[in-house]
C-alpha cells in the first residue's frame, strides 16, 4: 500500500510505515483533521508503542504443559520455621532482599479519586494504606539494622499523585533514597481482529498490562540497574490492597 499524497509533516512517513507493518494504518485516518499539537501527540504515541504485542496476541493459542512446582508443606514449616526465619533475616541483613509494591490502582471502589494506597482507613486517627505498608517495612528495617529498597509501581493515572502523597507525608519516616517509583507499562487496546482502537482522533486507546507486567516495567524504567547495583537477589512482590 502506498503512502497517501500530501503528507509532508515530519514523522508521518515513519509512523505510516510502522503501522503498515502491523496492518494498523487506520490509526492515521483522522490525521488531516488534527491541529499541530494533536498530530505531534499522535505521532509520538505511535512511535512509542510496541505493536508486536498485538500481533503476538493474535497467534493461535497453544496448549501449555503445566509442571507442578515444589511446595513446602505446613508440617515442614512448623518443624523448620526457625530455620527459615533465620535464613530470611540473614538475607535481609546482607541487603539481598528488595520489596516491590504494586500500587497502580485508584481508590474508585472505595469512593475516592486518589491513589488506592492514599485511602484513609483510620477510625480514631488518620491511617493510610501506604502508611500501614511502610510501617511494616520500618519494623523490618529496625530488626535488621538497615532499610530495604522499596520499588513502587504506579500507573499513568496516579504516578504524580502517589509521588506527591509520599513527599507530603515525608515517606512516613522511611528513607526516601530507598524508595523508587516506576510506572506500569500500557499496551494498545484492540478488537477481536487485532485492530487497535482510537480513544480520540489523536490518541490511541491503551490499558495497563496488568500486575504480571511488573518485571518488564521495572526493566523498562531502569529499576533492575538499582537491583543489580545494590546486590539484591530476592524481590518480595505484594499488592497495595492485599
State each model region's role.
Residues 25, 74-98, 112-242:
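Domain-scale recognition of functional cores that engage charged ligands
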Residues 16-79:
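Low-complexity, highly charged intrinsically disordered N-terminal segments
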Residues 6-10, 21, 109, 197:
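Generic signal for short, ordered secondary-structure residues
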Residues 16, 98-100:
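Exposed boundary/loop context
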Residues 103-109:
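Conserved adenylation A10 loop of the ANL superfamily
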Residues 1-17:
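Basic/polar N-terminal segments that are highly enriched at the extreme N-terminus
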